[in-house]
């Protein structure tokens, strides 16, 4: 089973964590500034009423507790927080795949500069969902899916 770390506790991070953990095919961890406000059981409800319920393996504000045991690190952050997050996780990234939901704000340039060659990189052109928090760290609404997604890999 692969382990995915979601960096970011906002609406997008909560929805992505809910959708991924719902499959039960991956273990999901969340790196957030406010771990005490998160529940281990989370859910997102889409605009058709489909419910994505999942259970998180771990929630922390300490990169050293989450990143080393993760196979994939996915930044679910606004562009202005990506560099700060990359610096936070850099000491613990060895050979993981590191990606960003928002990569059109310079993610690849920042990741090369900060991580060097220690990670495989990937990024989405745009966010895959429109998301809104219902209750922080517990539930969110997935208000719409993108019809098409583009992704870059290195």
Language-model region placement:
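Nucleotide donor/acceptor-binding cores
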Residues: 2, 96, 147-149
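Rossmann-like NAD(P)-binding element
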Residues: 51-93, 100
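Short beta-strand/turn micro-motifs composed of small residues
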Residues: 8, 32, 77, 102, ...
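Rossmann-like NAD(P)(H) cofactor-binding subdomain of soluble oxidoreductases
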Residues: 79-138
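Short beta-strand and adjoining strand-loop segment in the mid-core
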Residues: 137-154
């Amino acid at each position: 089973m692969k382990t995915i770390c979601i960096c970011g506790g906002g609406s997008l991070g909560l929805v992505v964590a809910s959708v991924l953990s719902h499959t039960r095919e991956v273990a999901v961890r969340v790196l957030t500034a406010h771990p005490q406000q998160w529940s281990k059981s989370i859910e997102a409800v889409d605009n058709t009423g489909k419910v994505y319920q999942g259970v998180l393996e771990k929630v922390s504000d300490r990169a050293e507790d989450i990143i080393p045991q993760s196979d994939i690190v996915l930044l679910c952050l606004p562009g202005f927080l990506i560099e700060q997050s990359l610096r936070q996780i850099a000491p613990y990234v060895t050979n993981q795949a590191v990606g960003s939901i928002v990569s059109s704000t310079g993610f690849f340039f920042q990741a090369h500069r900060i991580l060097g060659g220690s990670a495989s990189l990937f990024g989405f052109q745009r966010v895959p969902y429109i998301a809104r928090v219902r209750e922080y760290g517990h539930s969110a609404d997935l208000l719409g899916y993108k019809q098409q997604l583009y992704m870059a890999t290195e």
